[in-house]
C-alpha cells in the first residue's frame, strides 16, 4: 500500500518569508505552489512543503535529506551560499570539516555513507549524503 506511494515531507516554520528566502537563496528551490500559510516544493524524486506553525518546534534529528553524487562539491557550493554545517564529535559520529564517514548502510545504498548536516532558517535539521560503494 504505502510502499507504492510518493513520500512527501512537511517542515514547520515560524516565519514563512524567511524560510522561502533560505530555500531559494541558499538551496536554489522555488515553490511550485503556495497558499496562505504554506509553500510546496518539488524535487526530482519527491516533494516537501513548509507550513507556518507557531506551536511546533524544529526537530533535533534529521528531518529531510538529499542524496548527492559528490558531497565535497555540494558542501562547498552550499557554504558559498552561506549555509553553515553542523560539527559533531560523538561516539560513533564525528565530522571533519562538516562531513562524517558512516560505516554500514542498507545493502542497496552501498557499504556506508558520507554525510553532512545543516539547519534551515527555522532550525530544522537537514542533511546531504553520498553513498559509499565498494
What kind of feature is each model-predicted range?
Residues 42-45, 121:
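Short strand-coil-strand connectors
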Residues 28-34, 85-87:
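Short secondary-structure junctions
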Residues 2, 66, 75-134:
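Vicinal oxygen chelate
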Residues 1-20, 47, 61-64, 129-134:
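N-terminal beta-strand motif that seeds the catalytic metal site of vicinal oxygen chelate
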Residues 53-80:
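Helix-adjacent hinge/juxtasegments
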Residues 37, 53-54, 131:
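Residue-level structural signal for beta-strand termini and adjacent loop
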Residues 17-26, 116:
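Conserved active-site alpha-helix within GNAT-family acetyltransferase domains
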Residues 18, 36-39:
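Short glycine/proline-centered loop/turn elements that form peptide/ligand docking sites
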Amino acid at each position: 500500500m504505502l510502499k507504492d506511494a510518493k513520500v512527501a515531507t512537511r517542515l514547520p516554520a515560524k516565519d514563512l518569508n524567511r524560510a522561502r528566502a533560505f530555500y531559494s537563496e541558499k538551496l536554489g528551490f522555488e515553490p511550485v505552489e503556495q497558499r496562505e500559510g504554506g509553500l510546496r516544493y518539488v524535487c526530482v524524486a519527491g516533494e516537501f512543503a513548509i507550513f507556518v506553525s507557531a506551536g511546533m518546534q524544529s526537530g533535533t534529528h534529521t528531518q529531510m535529506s538529499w542524496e548527492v553524487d559528490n558531497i565535497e562539491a555540494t558542501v562547498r557550493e552550499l557554504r558559498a551560499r552561506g549555509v553553515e554545517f553542523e560539527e559533531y564529535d560523538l561516539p560513533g559520529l564525528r565530522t571533519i570539516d562538516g562531513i562524517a564517514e558512516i560505516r554500514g548502510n542498507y545493502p542497496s545504498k552501498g557499504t556506508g555513507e558520507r554525510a553532512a548536516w545543516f539547519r534551515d532558517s527555522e532550525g530544522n535539521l537537514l542533511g546531504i549524503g553520498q553513498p559509499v560503494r565498494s
